[in-house]
Amino acid sequence: TVANLDSIATLLRCSGVDIVALQEADGPSFWSGNFNHVDYLADNGAFSQSVQGMHVNGLGLSYGTALMANLALRDPKAITFDPSLSPVPKGFTVSTVSWPGSPGTDVDIVSVHLDFASKSIRRQQADELIEAVRRRGRPVIIMGDFNTGWEENSTVQHISRALSLTAYSPEEAGLETFPTFGERLDWILVSPGLSFRSYHVLPDPVSDHRSVIAEVVLEDTAKATRLD
């Protein structure tokens, strides 16, 4: 509803984040009320830039992953995972940003949504993501709904190991993002040379998942960017 979008926009404005990653972000469709929810959030959340990938299109539905930012989003790309893997398509959106205060330092930002039902499908989707990140060849921050926790051999561990990424205190209690089952399904992963200055799961019930806000530092300059 518009009221819920307004609540999200208010939360984003108050948080002061530089970059936002969205999953199940609606475009214009019968289901969404025939307007683009990402454009609405960008306008009302005070973000100058947005990119969106529609991974589901049809039957009155149009939604996918998206990024919003107050930094220039360059070299954008949206990839829908192999549709033969799952009846409900998932995918990711990626763009490049220049790190604030550090000219010449480019970082890829990814918003990803993995399958909710099957570990084997998540693993295959993860391999598509890993290959795409490697091809782009930049440091990366991956944010999104991985639909899995940090258990041994989970998909989020697989991605982290394959790309040498770090998660914030992956086994710490109190960072659950899916309160219905008390699970941590939403993650932020960062490349070497980047580190977390702060990390919070917000209590605001703006969706069935809780929002995550992190402040990420470029280690050699201590220049920080706030992410949601």
Task: Describe the function of each predicted region.
Residues 29-34, 49-69, 86-88, 147-213:
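Active site of divalent-metal-dependent phosphoester/diester hydrolases
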Residues 142-143, 149, 211-228:
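Surface polyanion/phosphate-binding segment centered on an Asp-His-Pro turn
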Residues 1-44, 57-59, 127, 218-228:
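N-terminal, active-site-proximal structural segment of metallo-dependent hydrolase catalytic domains
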Residues 25, 112-114, 144-146:
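Active-site metal-binding loops of divalent metal-dependent hydrolases
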Residues 13-17, 42-47, 73, 131-138, ...:
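Sec-exported extracytoplasmic/periplasmic mature domains
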Residues 61-63, 69-75, 87-111, 194, ...:
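Beta-strand-turn-beta hairpins that frame and shape the catalytic cleft
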